Amino acid sequence: MNHPVAVALSDFSSLFLQAWRDTGHGFPRSEDLVGLESPCVEHDSGDEVTWKPITRQPQGDLAGVEKGIEIELHKDIIDFYSTQFSGDMAAKFGEIELDLLQVFSEQDGVRLQENILGHLVTQRRLKLKPTVFIGVIDSADKVIAICNLTGEVILETLGKNERDVLAKDVASFLQQLVPVVREA
């Protein structure tokens, strides 16, 4: 786990967990994850799940995406999605509130790869530069994404060539995030 993205993601995950502890909630909680199997689940009450990010051993990959669209993904994208299991984590980047997308389980990883593949196919059809989403904001047509060509983290308008660079790379983006605690 020496890759800068893996280290920055682990560091942010630790800050996220600490933010939950500091508010007296213990582990992060979610009603959306009830009944789902994952190595990061601490407790499933039937009404809500408590969870914590854990290192993924062995590290996963996104080979299904790369084979499916015949493209080599930027190493930062692979490291972002393959180094840990975690629920999505709420954060702020400057004034932008977002949910940092994560892989919750092996099954969730398969679903994620299908979604990424669909996203890349649509971009290819629209003749847009390839990106992979890593975060969602409160907007139906914008996502936080990694540009596959440059590794920059961008605020992207889906289906259009409208992109604002947020950070030069994923590690620096993650280092600038501030955890947000949202109660279920």
Swiss-Prot record:
Membrane topology annotation: Peripheral membrane protein
Gene Ontology terms: cellular component: cytoplasmic side of plasma membrane
Domain of life, per lineage: Bacteria
Native source species: Photobacterium profundum (strain SS9)
Main location: membrane
Functional note: Interacts with the SecY protein in vivo. May bind preferentially to an uncomplexed state of SecY, thus functioning either as a chelating agent for excess SecY in the cell or as a regulatory factor that negatively controls the translocase function.
UniProt xrefs under InterPro entries: Syd, Syd_sf
Family: Belongs to the Syd family.
UniProt keywords, alphabetically: Cell inner membrane, Cell membrane, Membrane
Localization annotation: Cell inner membrane
UniProt KW Methyltransferase keyword: no
Name of the molecule in the record: Protein Syd
